Amino acid sequence: MELTLWTYEGPPHVGAMRIASSMEGVHYVLHAPQGDTYADLLFTMIERRGRRPPVTYTTFQARDLGGDTAELVKGHLREAVERFNPEALLVGESCTAELIQDQPGSLASGMGFNMPVVGIELPAYSKKENWGASETFYQLVRGILSKQPSEESGVSHSPAAWKSEGRRPRVNLLGPTLLGFRCRDDILELEKLLNQHGIDVHVVAPLEARPADLMRLPNADLNVCLYPEIAEATCLWLERNYGMPFSKTVPIGVGATKDFLEELHQLLEMPAPNPGEGAEQSKLPWYSQSVDSNYLTGKRVFIFGDGTHAIAAARIADQELGFKVVGLGTYSREMARPVRAAAKELGLEALISDDYLAVEAAMAEAAPELVLGTQMERHSAKRLGIPCAVISTPMHVQDVPARYSPQMGWEGANVIFDSWVHPLMMGLEEHLIGMFRHDFEFVDGHQSHLGHLGGHQSQTEQQQSQAATNPSTQSNTDSSSEESPLWTPEGEAELAKIPFFVRGKVRRNTEKYARQAGCRRIDSETVYDAKVHFRA
């Protein structure tokens, strides 16, 4: 067991809660102690929903362990069914309740409820949230469709079926959930995009789907796997049992959206889409070819998040914006293989870890100019003084905007372009201010044109301001006890001319060179010599 202050994923029963909360007419009875009810806050505070998740907790206490906890489970099952009258009932247990081994799913199956009852067994000590969501969605679809044998679905999934029936092709969008990254907006964007290409959306699941909608899944011509972490297992099962093909391209970015449309048109035997549609619909291709984008070319970027968004971000950064990807990783071990493959194409070794300290150390070692990650990478990047944009869950409430802000499709590419480029542009402004801070116009004590109304800092305020803007002088005092070389005012002035997002790396390299060369004081010449040494 490992103690930590941060985790990228919750236990698997939180993933089951995401599926139940995303759907309509589904209720989840969770065998759990009172302390495990914290997950409600994820939906009301982070997702900002106006209602609590449809979950009933058994909330057993220590004194209940001396009695029959199975009867406690049965009582809560009856109460939940009588009160909520769900169309389908999910039954599971939290990580703590798993130790009691009451098997609430088996208990519920034998109580004779007149609705589908799906028992969810999630290994809490070996799997995590995304796997729990995937397994819950898979078991729910399988449990509901098991009442409808595949030969009775009455649908042929040959590409020519929709043509012979004289209708438009229809697809299922599988994978979006609550607490996913911009899932609701992604669905709206894809529904609009597919409609423009003559393709109807048949069922969206699990988000806002009902159990009856899951019964209609086989009536579509193919499935679109939007989020492999959640929907790939279900898509594979539908392919095996109903012969339903599914798309494997996630349409995040201009190039991926183009490939996604080509894949759908090919699977459905439709005419090929317009290859120039991306340039017409999205501003990202135009900007990446403009003169202004030269500032972005070759920028070093570090990427970490869930597998789907990390892989998509790496492709956009490398192929569409001209960035240099210096780090790529994920916390999702289920997506380790495709992330490793994507990293190998970029000449990198993927970072597969759920230890935020290891991620921060890798980030500092890579010395990027932009970080694309989760909420935790935003905190780590702030400590390192690096611009950051959030591209993946886990996220904070500020990453759940009330406005329309998709990640998929042509409009999603525009949103991504804004989210990634703006931190770099603001970083450029900060660097320019730092470069010209000591010029005549920026001197703090310079008299205002308003005469006596102009501000005048006291000597103490000036010292505090200098300490805040130039923390390196204070760090020299602290590090002198470690026999580090001392920075002269000339050396500090030269260091201040270097962009802030690589200044830390330059400082470390210069001090390392000074130790090797036996220099006790670092001046401007030492900075130049270190630069030549490490470039050689």
Curated annotation (Swiss-Prot):
Component of the dark-operative protochlorophyllide reductase (DPOR) that uses Mg-ATP and reduced ferredoxin to reduce ring D of protochlorophyllide (Pchlide) to form chlorophyllide a (Chlide). This reaction is light-independent. The NB-protein (ChlN-ChlB) is the catalytic component of the complex. It catalyses: chlorophyllide a + oxidized 2[4Fe-4S]-[ferredoxin] + 2 ADP + 2 phosphate = protochlorophyllide a + reduced 2[4Fe-4S]-[ferredoxin] + 2 ATP + 2 H2O. [4Fe-4S] cluster binds at D36. It comes from Prochlorococcus marinus (strain MIT 9303). Belongs to the ChlB/BchB/BchZ family. This is Light-independent protochlorophyllide reductase subunit B. The lineage of its organism: Bacteria, Bacillati, Cyanobacteriota, Cyanophyceae, Synechococcales. Its EC number is 1.3.7.7. The keyword Metal-binding applies.
